[in-house]
């Protein structure tokens, strides 16, 4: 462990390799490049302190460097103990970001490092799962008056924050970046869809075609996972609790059944619900020998490991990121990435082109909080549509795509009520 006054990383000497990764992904993130140039010129965050809890890998690093380019003092800690890339955080430390993260850090270190990131007494918090915002409300209440607001990247985090708002304990405004069109329509669907299977295939080196894939949850992440599984040649089964989403999955061409029925026939199970104990003892007991389980939800609670451990007579690790649970009857069940985010633990997370849009929204959310915090209430907000559209237009422009524009006559027609049959 290599720790100094403003950082704690595995090894600072890894920085050069980290810079190579950051440089590579930045070439495929034109929207964030555009915003970085804008921030470098205008310095909107001069004198502003920003603390972030994120998956500390190469795309996230480019976001943090973009905020720093805008004049911010930036600190960061990991939002998952297993998603940190040690070479990338070394590069961030060298660049002057106050960063505290080590891949494989303990639960105690996880919160210790988060406290260190908060020691800058931030004006803005950028969160991924709402752990940092929750920690401030529970243990660092003395700094609440200095916090203008925060932003949240994930579905899971937004659920937690809305619960805080409903309970009347949220003390500052938070932007639900996850709920922006340019986030959930692309990041949650196309990003999660591709990166989840990237992680599963890297971890197992197994064929997907011909297998029964059970996708638990048919939100935007589940949609993407199911879509890509079908594209890889799998028979896809969706498990849902929402009757509308279940019907949608069936109309999309997927089989739909409850978890007990799916447990009997699934070869690969992927959870994406944001909820607890979605796959548990009663389901493990029904699974076939060799069944593989992976989680694409934020926390490691969707596949209930305590039940697996109680059922197992032997636990082994046949491959990196694969845990084998041998049961009394001889069956072997496999859990990938210790039940944590398989796309970030066993692979590199979402593609750069996808995170380009999500992190452009995060950068603009921070600027929006800085400019508007005095009039915002302690509630969960969605970014204005014009910011969504700005990100979309820059992305289209970078792809060489020109779209149609409404004529004045068409605009007038859409704004009128007189025209009928």
Swiss-Prot record:
One GO CC term on file: cytosol
Enzyme class: hydrolase
Primary location class: cytoplasm
Keywords (A to Z) from UniProt: Cytoplasm, Hydrolase, NAD, One-carbon metabolism
Cofactor binding notes: Binds 1 NAD(+) per subunit.
GO biological process: L-homocysteine biosynthetic process; one-carbon metabolic process; S-adenosylmethionine cycle
InterPro entries assigned to the protein according to its UniProt record, in alphabetical order: Adenosylhomocyst_ase-like_sf, Adenosylhomocysteinase-like, Ado_hCys_hydrolase_NAD-bd, NAD(P)-bd_dom_sf, S-Ado-L-homoCys_hydrolase_CS
Binding site for substrate: 128, 153, 183, 187
Cofactor: NAD(+)
Catalytic activity: S-adenosyl-L-homocysteine + H2O = L-homocysteine + adenosine
Subcellular location: Cytoplasm
Functional pathway: Amino-acid biosynthesis; L-homocysteine biosynthesis; L-homocysteine from S-adenosyl-L-homocysteine: step 1/1
Source organism superkingdom: Archaea
Molecular function terms, GO-annotated: adenosylhomocysteinase activity
Positions that bind NAD(+): 154-156, 188, 217-222, 240, 275, 296-298, 343
EC number(s) given by UniProt: 3.13.2.1
HAMAP family in the record: AdoHcyase
NCBIfam families, sorted: ahcY, PRK05476.2-3
Family statement: Belongs to the adenosylhomocysteinase family.
Protein name: Adenosylhomocysteinase
Origin species: Pyrococcus furiosus (strain ATCC 43587 / DSM 3638 / JCM 8422 / Vc1)
Phylogenetic placement of the source organism: Archaea, Methanobacteriati, Methanobacteriota, Thermococci, Thermococcales
């Amino acid at each position: 462990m290599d720790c100094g006054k403003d950082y704690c990383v595995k090894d600072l000497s890894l920085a050069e390799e980290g810079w190579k990764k950051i440089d590579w992904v930045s070439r495929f993130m034109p929207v964030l490049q555009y915003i970085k140039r804008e921030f470098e010129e205008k310095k909107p965050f001069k004198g502003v302190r920003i603390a972030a809890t994120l998956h500390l890998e190469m795309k996230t690093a480019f976001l943090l460097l973009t905020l720093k380019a805008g004049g911010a003092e930036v600190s960061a800690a990991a939002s998952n103990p297993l998603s940190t890339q040690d070479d990338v955080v070394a590069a961030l430390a060298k660049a002057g970001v106050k960063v505290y993260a080590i891949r494989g850090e303990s639960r105690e270190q996880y919160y210790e490092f988060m406290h260190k990131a908060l020691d800058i007494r931030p004006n803005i918090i950028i969160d991924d799962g709402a752990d940092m915002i929750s920690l401030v409300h529970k243990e660092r209440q003395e700094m609440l008056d200095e916090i203008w607001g925060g932003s949240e990247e994930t579905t899971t985090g937004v659920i937690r924050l809305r619960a805080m708002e409903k309970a009347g304990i949220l003390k500052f405004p938070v932007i639900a970046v996850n709920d922006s069109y340019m986030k959930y329509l692309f990041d949650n669907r196309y990003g999660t869809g591709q990166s989840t299977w990237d992680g599963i295939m890297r971890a197992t080196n197994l064929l997907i075609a011909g297998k029964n894939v059970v996708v638990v949850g048919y939100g935007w992440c589940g949609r993407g996972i199911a879509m890509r599984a079908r594209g890889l040649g799998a028979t896809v089964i969706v498990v849902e609790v929402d009757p509308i989403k279940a019907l949608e999955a069936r109309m999309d061409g997927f089989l739909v059944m409850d978890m007990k029925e799916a447990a009997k026939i699934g070869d690969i199970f992927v959870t994406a619900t944001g909820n607890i104990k979605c796959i548990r003892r009663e389901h493990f007991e029904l699974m076939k020998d060799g069944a593989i389980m992976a989680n694409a939800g934020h926390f490691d609670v969707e596949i209930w490991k305590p039940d697996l451990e109680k059922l197992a007579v032997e636990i082994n690790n046949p491959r990196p990121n694969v845990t084998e649970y041998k049961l009394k009857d001889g069956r072997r069940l496999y859990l990938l990435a210790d039940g944590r985010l398989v796309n970030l633990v066993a692979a590199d997370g979402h593609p750069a082109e996808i995170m380009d849009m999500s992190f452009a929204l995060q950068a603009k959310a921070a600027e929006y909080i800085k400019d508007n915090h005095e009039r915002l209430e302690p509630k969960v907000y969605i970014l204005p549509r014009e910011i969504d559209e700005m990100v979309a237009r820059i992305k289209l422009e970078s792809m060489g795509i020109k779209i149609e524009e409404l004529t004045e006559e068409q605009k007038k027609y859409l704004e009128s009520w007189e025209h009928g049959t």
